[in-house]
Amino acid sequence: MDGAGLRMGRLFDRDSGRSFITAFDHGTTLRVPPEVGKPLDLLEKIVAGEPDGVLVGPGLLKQGAHLFAFRGAPVPVLRADWTIIDESMKGELGERYRVLTTPKEGAALGAGALVMYLIMGPEEGTMFADNVRAVAHAAHEAHQVGLPLIVEATLWGSRITEKKDPDLLAHICRIAGEIGADAVKTEYTGDPQTMAHVVAGCPVPVLTLGGARGGEDAVVESARGAIEGGAKGLIFGRNVWQADDPVRMTASLREVVHGVPVSG
């Protein structure tokens, strides 16, 4: 096992073999309502929920490093790239993709893993080709500095209308694994059986994303379906930090992932 494998292992529970990561990297790609609170205050609440990891951008990791600087803290996971997800911004600027930081810089910031997008179906084929090249290059560099790379493999390109198509999700997840991902973050198909199809075709662990905020019962049910379908964990964001009680919501989702009720 190399350093990347060792650090990847720290994200996964020893007993359940699964991981629950809270995503808090939305400020670069989506319009976050100011009324949800100050970023560092929200990050503190997220850490208090005791997820296995927290996904943040470079700036917030710098500003909130003290929240991860203790034994037993969640693993800081670094968003290393940028794309346009907000539909109104897409209308103004089109589809765009850029790399934000390098694995070496991520290691210097204290990240325990990196996350990068891999988006199938953009209007311009060159964007997908450049995206594949950037992810493959980062995967190589990340292992040189002992960091694992989680690839967020999705169908968010404008040429694809069905964003949860099981066959296409299986295809993009397989591509992610083949070009060097240590794990994949992707959509839950909405059905455990079709999710199992996606998981079976991917050579690395699959974790599912949460998407737009929904009702608590629906979110928990979706999480259960993903785990039943073979997902090795969840990377949920808005459904945690936009919840009325982020700590309680984290506890509910951790129970789904790890199968152990969280006391308190």
Stretches with model-predicted labels:
Residues M1-R14:
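N-terminal basic/disordered segments at the start of proteins
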Residues R14, S19-K62, H66-F70, V75-I85, ...:
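Alpha/beta enzyme core
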Residues R238-D244:
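A short, acidic, flexible beta-alpha connecting loop/helix-capping segment that sits on the rim
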Residues G211:
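Cofactor-binding loop segments of dinucleotide-utilizing enzymes, especially the Rossmann-like FAD-
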